[in-house]
Every structure is written in structure tokens, then in C-alpha cells.
């Protein structure tokens, strides 16, 4: 999985970015999405508030904003077209590869790590996996969805070694 890391704050270390990249690659393998691409942008509360307002109509900062990429129009090709034209098949794979982007507020991550009594690294990892699952179709609107999504994110974090301390 290719993950573009963007640090708009200048405060997220290369080591932290690498750890989150590895964690998301691990999560991608866990749910069978290894051949996908995404972006993670680290921002402050002011910027995440702007993103929330622009894309979700939410007038406040949140810890993570997940923007799932959905093409405006679906391009449909007959399977024979793809078999006859390897270049077209490759182009379609690339087209389908980008799944979305995350905006993680480092301010909220610090606040929540302190509030929950665990490390900043654990909180950043939690937010990354939580957002990643959202852009892959997981949600927590119903108790059943919540149990599935939260169970999976805890399973991923624990298997990776990011437990609550």
C-alpha cells in the first residue's frame, strides 16, 4: 500500500510518520487492501476545523476526518476489453487504487492521549486506524457496526503492538 504523508504542522517526526505508515500497511493487509493508495495529512485544530466545515458541514475541530474517495462517475468496461488491452487494465487498476485521505489533528491527539492516560503514539495510531477503516467502508452508526469496527481496530492495534499503557 502506498501512503503519502503530509505534515502541515512541521511537528510530526519522521519516525512517527514511518510508524503510522507501517501500521496502516499492516491494517491494509489485515483487511485485504494492500494494493491501494491513500494520503494522511497531519494538521492542527484550526485546519481540521476548516476541513470539517468544508467537507462535512461540522463547525468544530475533531480528532480525525476521513474522506473516502468515490469517483463521480463509474467507468464500466467489458471484461474482454480489459483482457484485450493490458494498458487499459493497468490504468483501471490505478484508477481504483486511491481510496481516500485522512486529516489527523495532532492537537486533539495530544489532548486525548492525556485524557485517556495512554501515549501520544498510541493515540496517533488509533486515529490513523480509525480513519483508515472509515475510508474502507466501516462505520459505527449502529451498535452492530460499532462492535464490528471497534473490535477490528482494537484487533489491529493489539496485533501491531500498540496497546493501551
UniProtKB/Swiss-Prot annotation:
The keyword Repeat does not apply. Single strand-specific metallo-endoribonuclease involved in late-stage 70S ribosome quality control and in maturation of the 3' terminus of the 16S rRNA. It is found in: Cytoplasm. HAMAP family: Endoribonucl_YbeY. SUPFAM superfamilies: Metalloproteases ('zincins'), catalytic domain. Zn(2+) binds at residues 130, 134, 140. Its cofactor is Zn(2+). Disulfide bonds: none annotated. The keyword Metal-binding applies. One of its GO terms (biological process) is rRNA processing. GO terms for molecular function: metalloendopeptidase activity; RNA endonuclease activity; zinc ion binding. Pfam families: YbeY. Its main location: cytoplasm. GO terms for cellular component: cytoplasm. NCBIfam families: rRNA maturation RNase YbeY. It is an enzyme of class 3 (hydrolase). Its EC number is 3.1.-.-. This is Endoribonuclease YbeY. Binds 1 zinc ion. Keywords: Cytoplasm, Endonuclease, Hydrolase, Metal-binding, Nuclease, Ribosome biogenesis, rRNA processing, Zinc. It comes from the Bacteria. Belongs to the endoribonuclease YbeY family.
Amino acid at each position: 500500500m502506498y501512503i503519502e504523508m503530509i505534515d502541515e504542522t512541521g511537528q510530526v517526526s519522521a519516525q512517527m510518520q514511518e510508524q503510522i505508515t507501517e501500521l496502516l500497511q499492516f491494517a491494509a493487509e489485515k483487511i485485504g487492501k494492500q494494493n491501494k493508495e491513500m494520503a494522511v495529512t497531519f494538521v492542527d485544530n484550526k485546519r481540521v476545523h476548516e476541513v470539517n466545515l468544508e467537507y462535512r458541514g461540522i463547525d468544530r475541530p475533531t480528532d480525525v476526518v476521513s474522506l473516502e474517495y468515490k469517483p463521480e462517475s463509474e467507468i464500466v468496461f467489458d471484461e474482454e476489453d480489459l483482457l484485450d488491452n493490458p494498458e487499459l487494465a493497468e490504468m483501471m487498476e490505478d484508477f481504483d487504487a486511491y481510496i481516500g485521505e485522512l486529516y489527523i489533528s495532532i492537537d486533539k491527539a495530544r489532548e486525548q492521549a492525556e485524557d485517556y492516560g495512554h501515549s501520544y503514539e498510541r493515540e496517533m495510531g488509533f486515529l490513523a486506524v480509525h480513519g483508515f477503516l472509515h475510508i474502507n467502508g466501516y462505520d459505527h452508526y449502529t451498535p452492530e457496526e460499532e462492535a464490528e469496527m471497534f473490535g477490528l481496530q482494537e484487533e489491529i492495534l493489539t496485533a501491531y503492538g500498540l496497546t493501551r499503557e
